[in-house]
Amino acid sequence: MTRIGFMSDLHLDSNQFGDFEQQTLRQLLKEEGIDHLHIAGDLSNDLAKISLPFLETLKQEIPLSFNLGNHDMLGLSEQEISNYDFQVQQFGQTKLVSFSGWYDYSFVPEKSKEEHLRTKTNFWFDRRLERQLDDPSITAQTLQELEKLLMTLDGPIIVALHFVPHQDFLYDHPYFQRFNAFLGSQAFHRLFVKYRVKEVIFGHLHHRHQSRVIEGVRYHMRPLGYIREWELTRNFFNDFPQYKIPQMYRLHKRYNAVKDLVEFRDYKKKHLADELRDALTVIEVQ
Protein backbone atom coordinates (compact mmCIF):
# COMPACT_ATOMS: atom_id res chain seq x y z
CA MET A 1 0.00 0.00 0.00
CA THR A 2 1.34 3.43 -1.01
CA ARG A 3 0.00 6.62 0.55
CA ILE A 4 0.15 9.52 -1.92
CA GLY A 5 -0.35 12.98 -0.46
CA PHE A 6 -1.64 15.87 -2.56
CA MET A 7 -1.50 19.58 -1.80
CA SER A 8 -1.86 22.74 -3.87
CA ASP A 9 -1.62 26.51 -3.68
CA LEU A 10 1.10 26.72 -1.03
CA HIS A 11 2.04 30.25 -2.21
CA LEU A 12 5.34 30.04 -0.37
CA ASP A 13 6.26 33.68 -0.94
CA SER A 14 2.92 35.26 -0.03
CA ASN A 15 2.59 32.99 3.01
CA GLN A 16 6.20 33.60 4.06
CA PHE A 17 7.06 29.94 4.36
CA GLY A 18 10.16 29.89 6.53
CA ASP A 19 12.03 27.24 8.50
CA PHE A 20 9.22 26.72 11.01
CA GLU A 21 6.58 26.27 8.31
CA GLN A 22 8.76 23.85 6.36
CA GLN A 23 9.60 21.82 9.44
CA THR A 24 5.92 21.68 10.39
CA LEU A 25 5.07 20.39 6.92
CA ARG A 26 7.81 17.76 7.02
CA GLN A 27 6.65 16.56 10.42
CA LEU A 28 3.04 16.39 9.25
CA LEU A 29 3.95 14.27 6.23
CA LYS A 30 5.83 11.87 8.52
CA GLU A 31 2.93 11.65 10.95
CA GLU A 32 0.50 10.94 8.11
CA GLY A 33 2.77 8.25 6.68
CA ILE A 34 2.97 9.88 3.25
CA ASP A 35 5.13 7.90 0.83
CA HIS A 36 4.98 10.41 -2.04
CA LEU A 37 3.85 14.05 -2.17
CA HIS A 38 2.45 15.73 -5.27
CA ILE A 39 1.85 19.50 -5.32
CA ALA A 40 -0.78 20.55 -7.86
CA GLY A 41 0.46 24.02 -8.70
CA ASP A 42 0.96 27.51 -7.33
CA LEU A 43 4.01 26.92 -5.20
CA SER A 44 5.09 30.55 -5.60
CA ASN A 45 5.58 33.42 -8.06
CA ASP A 46 9.21 32.44 -8.68
CA LEU A 47 9.82 28.88 -9.76
CA ALA A 48 13.62 29.11 -10.00
CA LYS A 49 14.46 31.09 -6.87
CA ILE A 50 11.73 30.01 -4.45
CA SER A 51 9.85 26.88 -5.54
CA LEU A 52 12.66 24.66 -6.82
CA PRO A 53 14.95 25.25 -3.79
CA PHE A 54 11.99 24.49 -1.51
CA LEU A 55 11.27 21.28 -3.41
CA GLU A 56 14.93 20.27 -3.41
CA THR A 57 15.04 20.56 0.38
CA LEU A 58 11.76 18.71 0.84
CA LYS A 59 12.90 15.99 -1.57
CA GLN A 60 15.60 15.01 0.91
CA GLU A 61 12.81 13.88 3.25
CA ILE A 62 10.19 12.45 0.87
CA PRO A 63 9.79 11.58 -2.83
CA LEU A 64 7.74 14.26 -4.55
CA SER A 65 6.47 15.67 -7.81
CA PHE A 66 4.55 18.73 -8.93
CA ASN A 67 2.75 20.40 -11.79
CA LEU A 68 2.64 24.10 -12.55
CA GLY A 69 -0.12 26.50 -11.62
CA ASN A 70 -0.58 29.90 -13.20
CA HIS A 71 1.56 31.62 -10.54
CA ASP A 72 4.41 29.20 -11.22
CA MET A 73 4.37 30.22 -14.89
CA LEU A 74 5.46 33.79 -14.22
CA GLY A 75 8.60 34.48 -16.24
CA LEU A 76 8.57 31.11 -18.01
CA SER A 77 8.59 30.57 -21.76
CA GLU A 78 5.97 28.42 -23.45
CA GLN A 79 8.56 25.66 -23.88
CA GLU A 80 9.47 25.77 -20.19
CA ILE A 81 5.79 25.53 -19.27
CA SER A 82 5.21 22.56 -21.57
CA ASN A 83 8.25 20.74 -20.15
CA TYR A 84 6.37 20.27 -16.86
CA ASP A 85 3.12 19.07 -18.44
CA PHE A 86 1.80 15.52 -18.79
CA GLN A 87 4.05 13.68 -16.40
CA VAL A 88 3.07 10.06 -15.74
CA GLN A 89 4.16 8.21 -12.62
CA GLN A 90 3.27 4.65 -11.71
CA PHE A 91 2.40 3.38 -8.24
CA GLY A 92 1.66 -0.32 -8.49
CA GLN A 93 -1.11 -0.62 -11.08
CA THR A 94 -2.14 3.04 -10.68
CA LYS A 95 -0.94 5.84 -12.94
CA LEU A 96 -0.69 9.43 -11.72
CA VAL A 97 -1.05 11.91 -14.59
CA SER A 98 -0.19 15.53 -13.82
CA PHE A 99 -0.49 18.69 -15.90
CA SER A 100 -1.49 22.33 -15.45
CA GLY A 101 -4.70 22.71 -17.42
CA TRP A 102 -6.04 26.12 -18.47
CA TYR A 103 -9.32 27.92 -19.21
CA ASP A 104 -11.44 28.78 -22.23
CA TYR A 105 -14.07 31.20 -20.77
CA SER A 106 -16.77 28.52 -21.19
CA PHE A 107 -17.80 28.77 -17.54
CA VAL A 108 -19.14 32.27 -18.34
CA PRO A 109 -20.64 31.85 -21.83
CA GLU A 110 -22.90 34.91 -21.64
CA LYS A 111 -19.98 37.32 -22.02
CA SER A 112 -17.99 37.90 -25.20
CA LYS A 113 -14.33 37.07 -25.64
CA GLU A 114 -13.59 40.80 -25.70
CA GLU A 115 -15.34 41.30 -22.35
CA HIS A 116 -13.35 38.45 -20.81
CA LEU A 117 -10.10 39.90 -22.09
CA ARG A 118 -10.90 43.30 -20.60
CA THR A 119 -11.62 41.71 -17.22
CA LYS A 120 -8.43 39.67 -17.42
CA THR A 121 -6.33 42.69 -18.38
CA ASN A 122 -7.76 44.82 -15.58
CA PHE A 123 -7.95 42.34 -12.72
CA TRP A 124 -6.45 38.89 -13.27
CA PHE A 125 -2.94 37.71 -12.38
CA ASP A 126 -2.49 35.96 -15.71
CA ARG A 127 -2.17 39.24 -17.58
CA ARG A 128 1.45 39.06 -16.39
CA LEU A 129 2.10 35.79 -18.22
CA GLU A 130 3.45 35.60 -21.75
CA ARG A 131 1.46 32.78 -23.35
CA GLN A 132 1.86 32.28 -27.09
CA LEU A 133 -1.76 31.44 -27.93
CA ASP A 134 -5.08 32.84 -26.78
CA ASP A 135 -6.77 31.15 -23.84
CA PRO A 136 -9.32 29.00 -25.73
CA SER A 137 -6.56 27.78 -28.07
CA ILE A 138 -4.28 26.86 -25.16
CA THR A 139 -7.11 24.89 -23.59
CA ALA A 140 -7.99 23.13 -26.86
CA GLN A 141 -4.36 22.16 -27.34
CA THR A 142 -4.11 20.92 -23.75
CA LEU A 143 -7.26 18.83 -24.13
CA GLN A 144 -5.94 17.29 -27.32
CA GLU A 145 -2.66 16.31 -25.67
CA LEU A 146 -4.48 15.00 -22.62
CA GLU A 147 -6.75 12.77 -24.69
CA LYS A 148 -3.80 11.39 -26.64
CA LEU A 149 -2.17 10.44 -23.35
CA LEU A 150 -5.26 8.99 -21.66
CA MET A 151 -5.91 6.78 -24.70
CA THR A 152 -2.60 5.00 -24.06
CA LEU A 153 -3.13 4.26 -20.36
CA ASP A 154 -4.78 1.29 -18.70
CA GLY A 155 -5.52 0.48 -15.09
CA PRO A 156 -6.63 2.97 -12.42
CA ILE A 157 -5.81 6.61 -13.25
CA ILE A 158 -5.38 9.54 -10.86
CA VAL A 159 -5.16 13.02 -12.38
CA ALA A 160 -3.63 16.06 -10.70
CA LEU A 161 -4.09 19.44 -12.38
CA HIS A 162 -4.22 23.02 -11.21
CA PHE A 163 -7.30 24.47 -12.89
CA VAL A 164 -10.96 23.72 -12.16
CA PRO A 165 -12.43 20.87 -14.25
CA HIS A 166 -16.10 21.07 -13.24
CA GLN A 167 -18.69 23.82 -12.88
CA ASP A 168 -19.85 22.55 -9.47
CA PHE A 169 -16.82 24.23 -7.87
CA LEU A 170 -17.21 27.74 -9.27
CA TYR A 171 -17.70 31.05 -7.45
CA ASP A 172 -21.33 31.67 -6.57
CA HIS A 173 -20.96 35.20 -5.16
CA PRO A 174 -22.31 37.72 -7.72
CA TYR A 175 -19.18 39.92 -7.56
CA PHE A 176 -16.80 37.05 -8.30
CA GLN A 177 -18.84 35.21 -10.94
CA ARG A 178 -17.13 37.04 -13.81
CA PHE A 179 -13.84 35.49 -12.72
CA ASN A 180 -15.21 31.99 -13.26
CA ALA A 181 -14.15 32.48 -16.88
CA PHE A 182 -10.51 32.10 -15.81
CA LEU A 183 -10.90 29.06 -13.58
CA GLY A 184 -10.95 26.13 -16.01
CA SER A 185 -13.18 24.21 -18.38
CA GLN A 186 -15.90 21.56 -18.16
CA ALA A 187 -14.23 19.84 -21.12
CA PHE A 188 -11.65 18.35 -18.74
CA HIS A 189 -14.41 16.60 -16.82
CA ARG A 190 -15.84 15.15 -20.03
CA LEU A 191 -12.48 13.57 -20.84
CA PHE A 192 -12.13 12.22 -17.31
CA VAL A 193 -15.53 10.53 -17.64
CA LYS A 194 -14.75 9.20 -21.12
CA TYR A 195 -11.49 7.59 -20.00
CA ARG A 196 -12.77 6.46 -16.59
CA VAL A 197 -10.38 8.51 -14.51
CA LYS A 198 -10.76 7.37 -10.91
CA GLU A 199 -9.63 10.37 -8.85
CA VAL A 200 -8.92 14.03 -9.69
CA ILE A 201 -7.07 16.52 -7.49
CA PHE A 202 -7.03 20.22 -8.33
CA GLY A 203 -6.70 23.68 -6.76
CA HIS A 204 -6.56 27.24 -8.15
CA LEU A 205 -9.79 28.35 -6.51
CA HIS A 206 -8.99 28.90 -2.84
CA HIS A 207 -11.93 27.05 -1.34
CA ARG A 208 -11.74 23.65 0.32
CA HIS A 209 -14.48 21.17 -0.50
CA GLN A 210 -15.26 17.70 0.76
CA SER A 211 -14.46 15.13 -1.90
CA ARG A 212 -17.41 14.34 -4.13
CA VAL A 213 -18.18 11.91 -6.94
CA ILE A 214 -19.56 13.34 -10.19
CA GLU A 215 -20.39 10.88 -12.98
CA GLY A 216 -18.01 8.32 -11.54
CA VAL A 217 -15.08 10.72 -11.01
CA ARG A 218 -14.10 11.53 -7.44
CA TYR A 219 -12.92 15.14 -7.09
CA HIS A 220 -10.66 16.48 -4.33
CA MET A 221 -10.14 20.21 -3.82
CA ARG A 222 -8.30 21.23 -0.66
CA PRO A 223 -5.93 24.11 -1.57
CA LEU A 224 -3.93 25.77 1.18
CA GLY A 225 -4.47 29.27 -0.24
CA TYR A 226 -3.35 32.57 1.27
CA ILE A 227 -2.92 32.91 5.02
CA ARG A 228 -5.61 35.59 5.10
CA GLU A 229 -8.03 32.89 3.90
CA TRP A 230 -6.95 30.18 6.31
CA GLU A 231 -9.24 28.61 8.85
CA LEU A 232 -6.80 29.44 11.65
CA THR A 233 -6.97 33.14 10.74
CA ARG A 234 -10.76 33.04 10.85
CA ASN A 235 -10.67 31.18 14.15
CA PHE A 236 -8.22 33.68 15.63
CA PHE A 237 -10.84 36.41 15.43
CA ASN A 238 -13.37 34.15 17.12
CA ASP A 239 -10.96 33.45 19.96
CA PHE A 240 -9.70 37.05 20.16
CA PRO A 241 -12.77 39.14 19.26
CA GLN A 242 -11.11 42.30 20.58
CA TYR A 243 -9.06 42.40 17.37
CA LYS A 244 -12.01 42.37 14.99
CA ILE A 245 -12.22 45.29 12.57
CA PRO A 246 -15.35 46.97 11.16
CA GLN A 247 -14.76 45.49 7.69
CA MET A 248 -14.26 41.86 8.63
CA TYR A 249 -15.32 40.76 5.15
CA ARG A 250 -12.15 42.34 3.72
CA LEU A 251 -9.79 39.44 4.28
CA HIS A 252 -6.55 41.28 3.52
CA LYS A 253 -7.43 44.17 5.84
CA ARG A 254 -8.35 41.98 8.78
CA TYR A 255 -5.21 39.89 8.31
CA ASN A 256 -2.96 42.95 8.04
CA ALA A 257 -4.47 44.26 11.27
CA VAL A 258 -3.23 41.26 13.28
CA LYS A 259 -0.34 39.66 11.38
CA ASP A 260 2.36 41.30 13.54
CA LEU A 261 0.67 40.67 16.89
CA VAL A 262 2.43 38.30 19.27
CA GLU A 263 -0.94 36.68 19.94
CA PHE A 264 -1.46 35.92 16.26
CA ARG A 265 2.06 34.62 15.74
CA ASP A 266 1.70 32.28 18.69
CA TYR A 267 -1.74 31.20 17.50
CA LYS A 268 -0.38 30.41 14.05
CA LYS A 269 2.45 28.30 15.48
CA LYS A 270 -0.03 26.37 17.61
CA HIS A 271 -2.50 25.67 14.81
CA LEU A 272 -0.36 25.54 11.66
CA ALA A 273 -0.09 21.75 11.59
CA ASP A 274 -3.88 21.43 11.66
CA GLU A 275 -4.19 23.96 8.82
CA LEU A 276 -1.72 22.03 6.69
CA ARG A 277 -3.42 18.73 7.52
CA ASP A 278 -6.76 20.16 6.40
CA ALA A 279 -5.16 21.05 3.05
CA LEU A 280 -3.77 17.54 2.52
CA THR A 281 -5.55 14.89 0.45
CA VAL A 282 -4.37 11.31 0.91
CA ILE A 283 -5.09 8.55 -1.59
CA GLU A 284 -3.98 4.98 -0.92
CA VAL A 285 -3.08 2.78 -3.88
CA GLN A 286 -2.10 -0.87 -4.12
Regions found by a protein language model. Name each.
Residues 1-5, 88-98, 103, 108, ...:
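Beta-strand-turn-beta hairpins that frame and shape the catalytic cleft
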Residues 1-59, 73-75, 124-130, 286:
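N-terminal active-site segment of His-dependent metallophosphoesterases
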Residues 6-8, 37-42, 64-70, 83-84, ...:
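Active-site neighborhood of phospho(di)ester-bond hydrolases with catalytic His/Asp-centered motifs
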Residues 11-16, 44-50, 71-77, 89, ...:
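Active-site environment of divalent metal-dependent phosphoester hydrolases
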Residues 26-29, 79-93, 97, 142-155:
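Short amphipathic alpha-helices and their capping/turn segments at secondary-structure boundaries
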Residues 56-58, 65, 92-95, 166-251:
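Conserved beta-sheet core of the metallophosphoesterase superfamily
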Residues 98-154, 163-175, 247, 253, ...:
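Active-site-proximal loop/helix segment associated with metal-binding centers of metalloenzymes
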Residues 243-286:
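A short C-terminal boundary segment appended to hydrolase-like catalytic domains
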